[in-house]
Amino acid sequence: MASMKAAILNAPDGTPTYGDFPDPKLTEGRQIATMVAAGIHPIVRALASGKHYASKGAWPMIPGIDTVARTEDGALIYSGFIDPPYGTFAERMAVPAAMRFELPDGADPVQVAGGMNPGLSSWLPLIARKKELEKLGTVLILGVTGMAGLLAVQNAFSLGAERVIGTGRNAEGLLQAAKRQAETVTLTGDRQTDGAAIAKTFGSNAPCLILDFVWGEPAEAAFDALSYAEFKATDNVDIAYLEIGSMAGAEASLPASLLRSRRIRISGSGLGSASLAEILAQVPVYMKLIAERRVEVPTRVFPLSKIAEAWASNESGRRSVVVPG
């Protein structure tokens, strides 16, 4: 059987190794494509650990969920949804015809591979909220120092947000958010202190949307801030809270009084909460945003043969991207 070079994970919570793996089989509705660039996103690590709700729990496996690849007809495309145990950290993969999005002229494959997954995580709820309200006021981002958070700042402003407030602990990440015009709040890990700091930054203006990439204590601090902030025109306060990630903890304590005292809607945003049609409709839209450099995606590039080094690299605010070699 023919084989290819790939990143191979033999057990959960391990480190992928560079080696030979059987070539993917060509099945109906799929075509063979060659990897050009693929991002190591947090969800890639979570799926590989076997602990994510969407993990298939089968090893050995090739990690990776999305890619920029070149098809046999020469087209440069963004794709994903590779059938396990295959993934995108491989020389070749069988991509579904329904998930074939040609890159716009001038698009940098590394930027697209690094930015589509983290960028869409905020782009989808932002455009949905703007459609509801017609315009975006204040947007609060919990976990602004990571790649998804920094892209959320840029996404919010590109959609006309009046203010963006970002919270986090990493000083360099907060500086990068501030350079992108976000107002920042440095978290201490103390719920009361952090809640007061967020409330002070709100001032009298309630957020129309909260994008939460971390959950845990930062979410609890935000709940407290929403509870005792003195917003003007309280009859018009309408808050949408989107839980996207749980880097700071799987659980958070939600005061019942907050649900009674504020008009607030708390929901999740993930693989099971948005329709596939809604997600796919925004793929070319967001790719165009990246191609036009309207959002910047900080990346660090590794050859596939250095997958162990790439996997170990987890630089805040910079996405590791695997390329052939």
State each model region's role.
Residues 215-292, 325:
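Glycine-rich phosphate-binding loop and adjacent beta-alpha segment
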Residues 22-41, 48-87:
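Glycine-rich beta-strand-centered segment in the early N-terminal region that forms part
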Residues 65-66, 76-144:
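NAD(P)H dinucleotide-binding glycine-rich loop of Rossmann-like/cofactor-binding domains
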Residues 3, 135-138, 161, 207, ...:
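Phosphate-coordination loops involved in phosphoryl transfer and adenosine-cofactor binding
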Residues 88-89, 168-176, 251-256:
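Short, glycine/polar-rich helix-capping loops at beta-to-alpha or helix-loop-helix junctions
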Residues 2, 230-231, 276-325:
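C-terminal hydrophobic helical "lid"/dimerization subdomain
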Residues 115-191:
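Mid-domain Rossmann-like dinucleotide-binding core that forms the NAD(H)/NADP(H) cofactor-binding site
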